[in-house]
Amino acid sequence: MAMWVFGYGSLIWKTGFPFDESLPGFIKGYRRVFHQGSTDHRGTPDFPGRTVTLEAAHEEVCCGVAYKITKEEDKRDALLHLEVREKQYDQKEYLDFFTDSNASEPAVAGVMVYIASPDKKSNNNYLGPAPLEDIAKQIVKAKGPSGPNRDYLFNLEEALAQLGFKDKHVTDLANQVRHILSESEELDIDATAATANNV
């Protein structure tokens, strides 16, 4: 029996395990939010980054990619990889996956999904909601072993766009981060010019 894994964050563009088939599509009743703190990939314990998790949301959908894994050895390798990679995500759900918005039956039933819950007892890295500008400022500054937090956001934005998916939360956040970076560059240019004039 095949195992299916749903990716809605970095798994979309960086899978990290062997698979036999990938299907773009969506799950129902959830939305993607930058509410999970990352202290091991896109941030540090002293300054966490923010990565996506899923939040229950009636009548909303979360787009991503489902990966089919059939060989037993590949299943074991995938699970070993995911249990390390997603170790800060404290819930594992099995949800219906759709590829057609008009379909009443899922394309795949029971895709495995890693979710970081808001339960602080089981997930002490949960950061929760915050104003868009505050989340953007945190993402601009944070970086970890896997690289700058902003790269995670921009990679997600690009990966979704390449699949033809739109996610307002991701787009708005990416635009806010670009705005902050643009302002920072302008300040750097002004400071450099002022220093040059004083030499």
Curated annotation (Swiss-Prot):
GO terms for biological process: glutathione catabolic process. One of its GO terms (molecular function) is gamma-glutamylcyclotransferase activity. It is found in: Cytoplasm. Binds 2 Mn(2+) ions per subunit. Its main location: cytoplasm. Its EC number is 4.3.2.7. InterPro entries: ChaC, GGCT-like, GGCT-like_sf. Keywords: Cytoplasm, Lyase. GO terms for cellular component: cytoplasm; cytosol. Its cofactor is Mn(2+). It catalyses: glutathione = L-cysteinylglycine + 5-oxo-L-proline. The active site is at E86. It holds the Pfam family ChaC. Belongs to the gamma-glutamylcyclotransferase family. Converts GSH to 5-oxoproline and cysteine-glycine (Cys-Gly) dipeptide in vitro and plays a significant role in glutathione (GSH) homeostasis. Has no activity towards gamma-glutamyl-L-cysteine but possesses very low activity towards gamma-glutamyl-L-alanine. This is Gamma-glutamylcyclotransferase 2-3. It comes from Arabidopsis thaliana (Mouse-ear cress). The gene is GGCT2;3.
